[in-house]
């Protein structure tokens, strides 16, 4: 993001708890930016399943954990739309995978892709705020729905004219099954902007985003272009050359 800040004038020597002075008598309010991405997944086919991955430390007093550093993952299948509504959790290093259970990779696991969240935020406005009533996609970072060609926008078709949410909150209240279905991932991410003097008069670029990376989709690193060895012994150094 970049652009020009929305500013307000304040009396000399006056400060505000709701914004930053970025020049004499110029106040830039604190604010947030939120984005919602609709990702129509098709991982090795259209029938996919979503999983939430939480990391958990093992008990400190366990006999097998004498070095006190063991941890494991809990892989939770998300069966319905309401179950899939979740937020990031740093305490659990939470992530999500999306898999095709009918297609197996070289080690017999489902092929899939993994969501790697980037920088994010939660809304500080109350749920009573009008913008949140109209754009409830900010309530959760992750939503999953079955594909529906009429459900194209996280905040519904006409959010500026609505009296309540007509988007993701309404869609997911149906609580439809999302197991082995043609599913859509909706990812919400945001930035909390506390303006600084360096943002004036024109902001430098600020980035936000996420990554969707293969997770067991390929059998090895697909960028590895070294051919497999064909000789079984080290007797001949040039056996691969023909």
Regions found by a protein language model. Give the residues of each.
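Extended effector regions of multi-domain proteins
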Residues: 1-242
């Amino acid at each position: 993001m970049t652009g020009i800040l929305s500013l307000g004038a304040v009396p000399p020597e006056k400060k505000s708890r709701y914004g930053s002075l970025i020049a004499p008598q110029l106040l830039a309010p604190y604010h947030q930016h939120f984005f919602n991405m609709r990702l129509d997944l098709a991982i090795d086919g259209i029938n996919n399943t979503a999983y939430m991955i939480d990391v958990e430390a093992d008990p400190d007093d366990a006999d097998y954990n004498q070095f006190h550093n063991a941890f494991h993952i809990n892989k939770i299948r998300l069966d319905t739309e309401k179950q899939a509504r979740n937020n990031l959790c740093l305490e659990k290093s939470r992530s999500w995978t999306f898999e095709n259970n009918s297609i197996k990779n070289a080690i017999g696991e489902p092929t899939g892709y993994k969501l790697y969240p980037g920088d994010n935020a939660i809304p500080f406005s109350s749920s009573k705020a009008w913008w949140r009533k109209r754009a409830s996609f900010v309530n959760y970072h992750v939503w999953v729905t079955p594909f529906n060609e009429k459900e194209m926008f996280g905040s519904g078709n006409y959010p500026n004219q609505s009296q309540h949410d007509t988007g993701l909150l309404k869609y997911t209240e149906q609580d439809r099954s999302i197991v082995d279905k043609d599913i859509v991932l909706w990812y919400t991410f945001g930035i909390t902007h506390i303006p600084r003097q360096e943002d004036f008069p024109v902001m430098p670029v600020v980035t936000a985003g996420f990554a969707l990376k293969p997770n067991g989709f390929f059998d090895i690193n697909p960028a590895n272009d070294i051919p497999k060895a064909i000789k079984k012994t080290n007797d001949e150094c040039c056996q691969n050359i023909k």
